[in-house]
Design a protein with these regions (language model features):
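Mixed-charge interfacial surface used for oligomerization/domain docking
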Residues: 2-5, 11-25, 30-32, 92-95, ...
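A glycine-rich beta-strand to alpha-helix segment
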Residues: 87, 116-117
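N-terminal glycine-rich phosphate/adenylate-binding segment common to multiple enzyme folds
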Residues: 68-99
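N-terminal glycine-rich anion-binding loop in soluble enzyme alpha/beta folds
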Residues: 5-68
Length: 287
């Protein structure tokens, strides 16, 4: 059996050290702020980045193009390895299509290689949780094909439960409609968002006040997890660590004390959510 590598986009929003320790190659998206373009997770610190957003600075993101995708994948094929790429949701970006185009071109140049690109229909640490599960399967000795089959069967079981301070950033980035954005700007109303079966963000409710919105995404996670054993729950935040830690404690209390990984949301996805976002990701009932 040929050796294979698992690659991801930077939108997994996992700590760089975590990815490095596990030898996971990462293809970064980019963001531009104040006329400067940076790779995701590079340039500004999370605190610096979100402070700029709070001050009204705009951050614009760009997707991966096929040439960049090819440059990342080809070295592994030259080494005689097969490749599985877990791509950022096609419902939020054209990155998946760029990865797919590059893979099709590379398949002609490397006919003996297996190159699989999967549209995860996930984002942020939802992608990260999927990667966590995939690495477990690889450690268990599963083949490339077995892992790809598992991902396709289970990717819609990655639940995304999100609350934001307001929806203006998501609207500006084209991730939600103007109507939804207006809905979320009511005084003290905090939107509740999830990822649907098409990998798109949908506003599904509202709560009055921050604490209620944080409790709501935990309650959603508890309901989704019925019948599922979660050894790992992931939580991301937009420069609001106290809120993330509050959510983590409630998750541990209600879900049997799973391991919880907390990390800042990345600069690319954070460009669209804005500061103050908190999200919980876990395996659960199908979206």
């Amino acid at each position: 059996m040929r050796e294979f590598v698992i690659t991801v986009n930077s939108t997994v929003d996992l700590p760089k050290e975590w990815l490095k320790e596990r030898n996971v190659p990462v293809l970064p998206l980019k963001y531009t702020i104040d006329g400067q373009t940076y790779q995701d997770m590079e340039g500004l610190s999370a605190k610096e980045f979100f402070q700029k957003l709070r001050e009204g600075h705009m951050s614009v993101t760009s997707q991966i193009n096929p040439e960049e995708a090819r440059e990342m994948m080809e070295p592994f094929l030259k080494e005689g390895k097969d490749l599985l790429h877990l791509a950022f949701s096609s419902g939020l970006s054209e990155t998946y299509n760029s990865m797919r185009i590059a893979a099709e071109e590379l398949a002609e140049d490397y006919p003996d290689a297996k190159i699989i690109v999967i549209d995860t229909l996930c984002a942020c640490m939802g992608e990260g949780l999927l990667l966590y599960k995939v690495l477990q399967l690889k450690d268990q000795g599963k083949t490339l094909e077995e892992i790809a089959e598992w991902v396709e069967a289970n990717k819609l079981h990655i639940c995304h439960n999100v609350t934001v301070d307001d929806l203006n950033h998501l609207h500006r980035g084209g991730r939600i409609s103007k109507t939804a954005a207006v809905f979320g700007t009511l005084v003290q109303v905090k939107p509740i968002i999830h990822m649907d079966e098409n990998g798109k963000l949908q506003v599904i409710g509202k709560e009055r006040g921050r604490k209620r919105s944080l409790n709501k995404i935990v309650d959603m996670a508890v309901e989704q997890s019925e019948g599922w054993e979660n050894d790992m729950v992931m939580i991301t935040h937009g420069d609001c660590i106290e809120d993330a830690e509050y959510v983590a404690e409630r998750v541990k209390e209600k879900l049997g004390n799973p391991e919880v990984l907390i990390n800042n949301i990345g600069t690319v996805i954070g460009s669209h959510t804005g500061p103050g976002v908190v999200a919980v990701f876990l395996m659960g009932n199908k979206r």
